[in-house]
């Protein structure tokens, strides 16, 4: 049996008179008269109008037509004819197929939701539960096509640039890199566990020691962490590593790749400028290490103005080593009611630990602010000058520890940009954020952690300070690629000196015994001639999400998890039989 001679986006005027066989899903069915029934037949490539003329068809065919429901799968044989009522909105809109035979290959039951058209009331949970139906919808199917095009573009570019596509293990050793590992018990080695890789980081560095020189991989990675709109417990990563390179070599290669992928996915020439900004500047100006440059609204430091103020809530913060910073919401005076401002205050307090959110409204009648009575006329004037605020603007101020101020105002800046529609959604702004600090002090755990990861090399200008025992303000040879406020890639030049690598582990609180237990195989490899090397990893899902202007990463992944890490379609994760646990020498301590 021939199921089809053409796909449903293929037929044109040149095919008139041909007898064709078509198969697909019934998109819509219209009884336009007692004698005529129209069906839009759909497959991955498009739609074709099928005409059933009752006067020309057998009773058997008519019976089949009457039974048809939307989304039933059918096979049709018919003749291509010119369409009298042409549809310029689809490629096949100049023709139609007059059916001679029809076969229902698979009838469709009552659908849980409408496939064709737009259903604004369709919940994401419903879409994820019936993901195989959701994929039939134009938006999801197009996103998967774009995903394919993106990955093929990556493979073509990397191959032409001399990179080798090398697989690395999925069952590996637990060496936590920040997030929790997903653990897999070993039945054949009782009491031991594999870990699913958070990234191929160690293996790709070992490949450089092995002489591969230029490596890439489209890798599955796994992180057991709290989820957001742009995160998943399992995700796809473009992993890249190169030997005998400096930072500029890697960044130039990545810029070429990004432009090539953009052109192939969007069809547009990607003559984008890749700006560069040190981490310290990004945090100071935008309160974020991944600033969205599509709009202004920068943070302004008021600490020097407030330092000796009689307003103790501000001045004491500065005197105790904190910061007082502000952002300006332009022309927001009439738009931001007290209710909106209260919501903003609750936002920065709840999610970022800020003690509060002060505000100053510049109205046509003067200054309106609960804190105006605590500030001198000179201080208020200096704040307005420093923030460059104008009549109609609203100044928001946070006084707190440095981290709190930056995270709170950085997030508030984004919210202001969205609420005031300051962001050009058709624009793409690339930014390299470079020179991240090596260490970040975790106040809760009372220890230093790696800001990027512990395999990042230290900038030559700061190496002597590090070797002399300094831990604060040690910068690294790092480079994160940010697109429209989303980090789509992160990389660095790596440490390739075993002594320095051991010193980094020591600063992170790992004893020699712990370092040997976790990374002994890795440190041993460095003894046998490790070349200078560096690389980068792209988050495929997040990069595609930004390119396609989607709000959620789940809209570019075929079968994603929810924010709770669940697959609503398969109902994973699920409980398992006690027998399975016994075979793995595991006993659950969880009590419902």
UniProtKB/Swiss-Prot annotation:
It is found in: Cytoplasm. PROSITE patterns: AA_TRNA_LIGASE_II. Keywords: Aminoacyl-tRNA synthetase, ATP-binding, Cytoplasm, Ligase, Nucleotide-binding, Protein biosynthesis. GO terms for biological process: aspartyl-tRNA aminoacylation. One of its GO terms (molecular function) is nucleic acid binding. It catalyses: tRNA(Asp) + L-aspartate + ATP = L-aspartyl-tRNA(Asp) + AMP + diphosphate. Residues 201-204 are annotated as: Aspartate. L-aspartate binds at residues 177, 223, 452, 494. GO terms for cellular component: cytoplasm. Its main location: cytoplasm. Belongs to the class-II aminoacyl-tRNA synthetase family. Type 1 subfamily. Catalyzes the attachment of L-aspartate to tRNA(Asp) in a two-step reaction: L-aspartate is first activated by ATP to form Asp-AMP and then transferred to the acceptor end of tRNA(Asp). Homodimer. This is Aspartate--tRNA ligase. It comes from Fusobacterium nucleatum subsp. nucleatum (strain ATCC 25586 / DSM 15643 / BCRC 10681 / CIP 101130 / JCM 8532 / KCTC 2640 / LMG 13131 / VPI 4355). The lineage of its organism: Bacteria, Fusobacteriati, Fusobacteriota, Fusobacteriia, Fusobacteriales. The gene is aspS.
